[in-house]
Regions:
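Short glycine/serine/proline-enriched coil/turn segments at secondary-structure junctions
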Residues: 35, 61, 106-108
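Conserved beta-strand segments that form the floor/walls of ligand-binding pockets within enzyme
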Residues: 25, 52-53, 66, 98, ...
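Conserved Nudix-box catalytic region and its N-terminal flanking loop in Nudix hydrolases
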Residues: 46-88
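Beta-strand-connecting loop/turn residues
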Residues: 22, 48-50, 109, 122
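Acidic, metal-coordinating catalytic segment for phosphate/diphosphate chemistry
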Residues: 1-43
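Nucleotide phosphate-binding site architecture
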Residues: 5, 27, 52, 73, ...
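Unchanged
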Residues: 72-129
């Protein structure tokens, strides 16, 4: 980060008063910019005892198998995001979502939330990713 999103002036990395971590702080308006982890949501969609996997069509990890997942959007719940990602990536409609696993990857500042769910009617297709 180079510039303040509040006023446009430059920012510096420093520990603000009352804090114990480095943050980007504006040199003009003193706004503190918090950089937080990103939330990744996804599904483990099952139909008749089988789990739907996706083969990646884009980098990173093109041609690797993965579960349908992606970044959570503003204004949605984690189950809504997981269902949306399953539709976007595999054209699968899901229901009965139950939280299955939460894990974090601190090295890339991401938190993953996966839901077990039913793949409605077993149908799926190819998404753009």
């Amino acid at each position: 980060m180079k510039f303040c999103t509040s006023c446009g002036n430059s920012v510096i990395l420093q520990i603000p008063a009352g804090d114990d971590r480095e943050r980007f702080v504006c040199t003009s308006c003193e706004h503190i910019h918090y950089i937080n982890p990103r939330i990744i949501v996804g599904c483990v969609p099952a139909y008749e005892g089988r789990v739907l996997l996706c083969k990646r069509a884009i980098e990173p990890r093109r041609n690797y198998w993965t579960l349908p997942a992606g970044f959570m959007e503003n204004g949605e719940t984690t189950p809504e995001g997981a269902a949306r990602e399953t539709w976007e990536e595999a054209r699968g409609r899901v229901s009965n979502l139950e939280l299955y696993r939460v894990f974090d990857v601190p090295s890339i500042s991401q938190v993953y939330m996966f839901y077990r769910c039913d793949l409605d009617d077993g149908s799926f297709g190819v998404g753009p990713e």
